From Swiss-Prot:
Sequence motif DELLA motif, residues: 42-46
Cross-referenced InterPro entries: DELLA_N_sf, TF_DELLA_N, TF_GRAS
GO terms assigned for molecular function: DNA-binding transcription factor activity; sequence-specific DNA binding
The organism of origin for this protein: Solanum lycopersicum (Tomato)
Subcellular location: Nucleus
Name of this protein: DELLA protein GAI
Lineage: Eukaryota, Viridiplantae, Streptophyta, Embryophyta, Tracheophyta
Region (Leucine repeat II (LRII)), start-end ranges: 348-380
Region PFYRE: start-end pairs: 392-495
Region VHIID: start-end pairs: 269-334
Gene name per UniProt: GAI
PANTHER family on file: OSJNBA0084A10.13 PROTEIN-RELATED
Motif LXXLL motif location, chain numbering: 400-404
UniProt-annotated stretches for the region SAW: 498-574
Cellular component, GO annotation: nucleus
Amino acid sequence: MKRDRDRDREREKRAFSNGAVSSGKSKIWEEDEEEKPDAGMDELLAVLGYKVKSSDMADVAQKLEQLEMAMGTTMEDGITHLSTDTVHKNPSDMAGWVQSMLSSISTNFDMCNQENDVLVSGCGSSSSIIDFSQNHRTSTISDDDLRAIPGGAVFNSDSNKRHRSTTSSFSTTSSSMVTDSSATRPVVLVDSQETGVRLVHTLMACAEAVQQENLTLADQLVRHIGILAVSQSGAMRKVATYFAEALARRIYKIYPQDSMESSYTDVLQMHFYETCPYLKFAHFTANQAILEAFTGCNKVHVIDFSLKQGMQWPALMQALALRPGGPPAFRLTGIGPPQPDNTDALQQVGWKLAQLAETIGVEFEFRGFVANSLADLDATILDIRPSETEAVAINSVFELHRLLSRPGAIEKVLNSIKQINPKIVTLVEQEANHNAGVFIDRFNEALHYYSTMFDSLESSGSSSSASPTGILPQPPVNNQDLVMSEVYLGRQICNVVACEGSDRVERHETLNQWRVRMNSSGFDPVHLGSNAFKQASMLLALFAGGDGYRVEENDGCLMLGWHTRPLIATSAWKLLPDSGTGAGEVEL
């Protein structure tokens, strides 16, 4: 008898995995089709006592797969009547029976959700998630709790995707749905079409819970976010995963160690430079303003508040070398943070630039200064020479916003700039308000901003673009550059969302906010000309997905955005006639 039961189970398994009418060799199949009372039924399943029409096989297979996953995840929740050990013999309507089982499960889950009050608010549509609340939680939280956020979701891994059955065959396993019950609450994705909308709603609901200091609800929601993110693809999955990590760190109070460590950030920024046009646009537009300000000057001095790898200056040096009447003497002062290994990275950059200057025939002088913050810099050591003999330009790219984390720091630096009395100050900043005092406002702004930024990265990495202007197209983006660029932006997200106080240095503000600050500090805007606008637009033709980038002129400033959303802004400034003390009177 046992052997017969085993044989029957084996035949049943083959019937389910095949999911189609077999061409079997038994004499059963030789009967006249017209004489069968159940014509149209799947014959292989009919032998086992199940009445299923062949046309319904795909639907039954899908429902059985959902039922199998639901039954597997409910065993730990004490729902005994759905145990996989229960035997259901020969239902006359298999499709209806399976549907009733699923409906029963859904009802139980809905009751469970109501009791535990973990539904996401603001989602008016029917739930696409059936979730199980854990009745116990660990009393301590550590780095291990971040395993609820699937790190693999950053990459396009097919193994992490949930597939919905569309054919008559189906798998009897659900390994892709299995998660560690101690790490996440098990879910069943019934309808993936609404998952993207639900993911955004869950992110915002989690941020609202954090704002209200309801950390229990926030903990439950952040686990949902990690699971929902895996079901997405492309930019949405990546940006959601970074926001989930940032929220988890804030909830569990596991703050990133040295999250904005300078040397690593510099390396990541180099990859960001290669991947998309934002930094190139920043360097190009700032250089154009500096070049025009230096017209007719025989000696020029640029003070770079963020030298990093010095990628901005070869283009300016080459432009100066081609100037009618010969190039001016070019002096560059680079400011940068100390390196963890105490290497003199600034001098290495200066040495490379000196080699280039010698090649193109430009008289060149370089000095580097190390400072933890621009506010710590003593302007008297910059060797400012009289303005009659040397024109000075001050350049800041993605740097001044970091001063907003220290009270009075930005005012001190702007006052020092006034004492230096430069011909021009070029300022490039992110076009976003990530410095709001209310966390939920800052979170929502960051979510929209970085979603757009990741979307543009996704386009840059998809293909190379052919330029309609005849310029050679940009080669396809290296995959390593793309991934490291995502990490570069992800670290910013983590700082904006997870950190507070002086540790939160990514305090981006909008162009209008910088206008108010610069005007109140005694600076007057310098109009960036139409020539810079045209050349910046041509620059975008070099990049994949160039059609999505937009250059916009805004009251004399230039902004680069993706489709309709501005993302960075370049502005230029000069001192008002009655501001500053003039060269030779530098003081703090």
